[in-house]
A protein has these predicted regions:
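Domain-level signal for soluble alpha/beta catalytic cores
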Residues: 1-180
Length: 180
């Protein structure tokens, strides 16, 4: 939902909307997504426990669909809204239709620690797709080239059990090829 608002709330999980309004927002999009022949739904860049709960309720009502869940954890420790990963795992981890849990839209340097934390609270397969490493400056609305000039080593991610690895903001096909 936060990316839809384009107000930065996708980075904080602080939505100026009621739970009912959030349910209404996602219900229509969920119905449209489920009408198609999709095998797996990607529920990604989720910054808020309330949004995760809303989406899990929709998933529970659609037993023929499966999904992976990817979290927004910009501080490298918790969900963007401050919710612990243990709490998120308790909400997500016991659902048969959740195929994997992980993180996306974050600096590559934060991925390993978050995957270790998630692995400590769930046995679900792990996923990670990090940004390029550049930093978004919300004041100027520009990317700052702060990324190290070296490829990301995903070997430690794989060792923790990460099975899906990709790229998010500002990554290129060449970046993805280097991850393979």
């Amino acid at each position: 939902y936060g990316a839809f608002t384009a107000d930065g709330s996708e980075y904080t999980g602080q939505f100026d909307i009621s739970r009912t309004e959030l349910e209404d927002y996602h219900s229509l999009r969920w119905e449209l997504a489920c009408e198609g022949p999709s095998d797996v739904l990607a529920l990604e860049t989720l910054p808020s426990l309330i949004e995760i709960e809303v989406l899990m309720n929709l998933l529970d009502r659609t037993p023929d669909k499966e999904a992976w869940v990817s979290l927004s954890c910009p501080n490298g420790k918790t969900l963007a809204d401050g919710t612990s990963l243990e709490t998120v795992a308790a909400v997500v981890g016991d659902r048969r239709s959740v195929l994997a849990l992980g993180v996306n839209c974050l600096a590559p340097a934060l991925v390993e620690g978050l995957l270790r934390s998630i692995r400590g609270v769930t046995d679900l397969p792990l996923i990670a797709y990090a940004n390029s490493g550049e930093v978004w400056d919300s004041g100027t609305r520009n990317w700052l080239d702060t990324a190290p000039a070296r490829p990301v080593d995903t070997g430690s991610w794989r060792a923790i059990g990460c099975q899906i690895i990709g790229g998010c903001c500002r990554t290129t096909p060449d970046d993805i090829e280097k991850l393979a």
